[in-house]
Amino acid sequence: ILFAAWAKSAQFPLYMWLPSAMEAPTPVSAYLHGASMVKVGVCVFARALASAGDIPEIVGWVAIIDAVVTMLFGFLMYLPQKDMKRLLAFSTIAQLAYVFFGLGLSVFGSQMAFNGAVEHIFNHAFTKTLFFLIAGSLSFTLGTRMLPKIQGLMKKYPVTGVGFAVAATAIAGVPPMSTFFSKFQIISGGFAVGASNTVIFVLVCVMVVETVATFAWFLRWM
C-alpha cells in the first residue's frame, strides 16, 4: 500500500510523472495536481494506518526516511527550475512528503503527527491551488511563466504579488497561515517521538531546515 501511495502521490523514486504532467491549463493543474489527484496516495495510506491494528515499525521507518529523501530531492530539483508550473510540481512533491512524514510518525505512536498530516492534505490543497492560479494569472498577463522574467513581481503587479506572497508564506507554514498549524503538529509530534530516538530527532530537524529554506527561496522572486 505504501509503495502504491508513493506512485500516486509522486514520492521518490516514483515522482517522474508529475513534473511532466503540467501541460494542462492552470485551472486544470490546480484541481488535478494541487487539490485532488496527487492526494489520493496519501489518503489511501492514511486510511490504511487508521484502520489497521498493530503496524510494524519498519513501515514507519520506510515512510519517514523516504519522506525526508523526497523533501530534500524536491527542494534541490525546484531550485534550478525556471518554469513556474514545473517549480510547483516539485514543490508539491516536497509538500506531500511532509504528509508521509507525519503519517510515518504515527506508526511510532504520535497521534498529533497523524492529525497534522491529515490536516496538511487539505491545507496544501488550498495553498497550492492559489499558487497555480497565480501562475495562470502571470501567464495570461505577461505571456510567460518563466520566473526570471517576473522577478520583482510586487513592484510590477502588486495585486498578483500579494497573492504570490500569501501563497509563499502559506507553503512555508508561516503563522497565521493554516499550513503553520498542520506543520506544527507534524513537527511537534516528531520532536515528541524524537525525544527518545535520536535518528527521528535529526530527521525532524532536517524537515524544519527544508521548510525555512523553501520560504527563503520563494522570497527571491517577490
Where are these regions (language model features)?
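Hydrophobic transmembrane alpha-helices and their helix-loop junctions in integral membrane proteins
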Residues: 1-221
